[in-house]
Amino acid sequence: MQQSLLTFEQVYYTYPGTQQSVLNGITLQIPQGKRCALIGRNGCGKTTLFSLANGLYKPQQGRVYWQEKALQYDRKNLMQLRQKVGLVFQNPEQQLVASTVEEDISYGLCNLGLPIADIQQRVTQALVEFELTELAERPVHHLSLGQKKRVSLADVMVLRPELLLLDEPTAYLDRPQSRNLMAMLNKIYKSGTTILMASHDLDLVYCWSDWVFVMDAGRLILEGKPEDIFSQREILDSIELGLPPIYEIFITEELATKEHNSENFRRRILQFFC
């Protein structure tokens, strides 16, 4: 049986000062060892779900579990949770807190009280892995958006989380920057980290993910393998998501039949687009 890292059980959440719930009894399990994607139109509750997963918010009803243990919201347990569950915001400005790149990456480690030698070793390794060595002493406000996103990713990964949450990681990046970031995410995944990524880029979701969650109005309405999710055209159209253009190509019979082997055709298209 597939083990889940993080489980939401009948979770409700309403922001203070509002009456409408953002999450409406959502139940969801994030499977260990998978590249997961979360899709849904704006306002469906994706970002709120991430904030609950990281312990930034606490459910008003329902429970959140880490490896079958209910989350505890005292300071000690939240610090432990945030080492295990890393969260990268869509806007990197929300989590860049120090003066230079090197200082920013070391910030979380210093808060953990690790020995200086360990901090230096981890920071040096992160600078190399995220191609930031030449930027180590540069002020973070002098960086490009793509560089800031890499720093925010390094900030989280230096803590060695088991689960990485990413809110629209490729938003506002050009194609080369997106490819570079996705290559880094693939390395992170291959090193053993489970990933859950929220994205409006349905082509990326179809190409990259092993498992897809579909949210609408604060609820989970579909989950499954990408090919199974995107076969549900009627449901996806009803919530204004539609299908990935690349998937539309795959299901166009006229194109598929031009290849003797439709699987070879699929691989060629994936290589071109992804």
Swiss-Prot record:
<dbReference type="GO" id="GO:0006824">
    <property type="term" value="P:cobalt ion transport"/>
</dbReference>
<dbReference type="InterPro" id="IPR027417">
    <property type="entry name" value="P-loop_NTPase"/>
</dbReference>
<dbReference type="GO" id="GO:0016887">
    <property type="term" value="F:ATP hydrolysis activity"/>
</dbReference>
<dbReference type="InterPro" id="IPR003439">
    <property type="entry name" value="ABC_transporter-like_ATP-bd"/>
</dbReference>
<keyword id="KW-0813">Transport</keyword>
<dbReference type="GO" id="GO:0005524">
    <property type="term" value="F:ATP binding"/>
</dbReference>
<dbReference type="GO" id="GO:0043190">
    <property type="term" value="C:ATP-binding cassette (ABC) transporter complex"/>
</dbReference>
<dbReference type="InterPro" id="IPR050095">
    <property type="entry name" value="ECF_ABC_transporter_ATP-bd"/>
</dbReference>
<dbReference type="InterPro" id="IPR017871">
    <property type="entry name" value="ABC_transporter-like_CS"/>
</dbReference>
<protein>
    <recommendedName>
        <fullName>Putative ABC transporter ATP-binding protein alr3946</fullName>
        <ecNumber>7.-.-.-</ecNumber>
    </recommendedName>
</protein>
<keyword id="KW-0547">Nucleotide-binding</keyword>
<comment type="similarity">
    <text>Belongs to the ABC transporter superfamily.</text>
</comment>
<keyword id="KW-0472">Membrane</keyword>
<keyword id="KW-1278">Translocase</keyword>
<dbReference type="Pfam" id="PF00005">
    <property type="entry name" value="ABC_tran"/>
</dbReference>
<comment type="function">
    <text>Probably part of an ABC transporter complex. Responsible for energy coupling to the transport system.</text>
</comment>
<dbReference type="GO" id="GO:0042626">
    <property type="term" value="F:ATPase-coupled transmembrane transporter activity"/>
</dbReference>
<dbReference type="InterPro" id="IPR003593">
    <property type="entry name" value="AAA+_ATPase"/>
</dbReference>
<feature type="domain" description="ABC transporter">
    <location>
        <begin position="6"/>
        <end position="242"/>
    </location>
</feature>
<dbReference type="InterPro" id="IPR015856">
    <property type="entry name" value="ABC_transpr_CbiO/EcfA_su"/>
</dbReference>
<feature type="binding site">
    <location>
        <begin position="40"/>
        <end position="47"/>
    </location>
    <ligand>
        <name>ATP</name>
    </ligand>
</feature>
<keyword id="KW-1003">Cell membrane</keyword>
<keyword id="KW-0997">Cell inner membrane</keyword>
<keyword id="KW-0067">ATP-binding</keyword>
<dbReference type="InterPro" id="IPR005876">
    <property type="entry name" value="Co_trans_ATP-bd"/>
</dbReference>
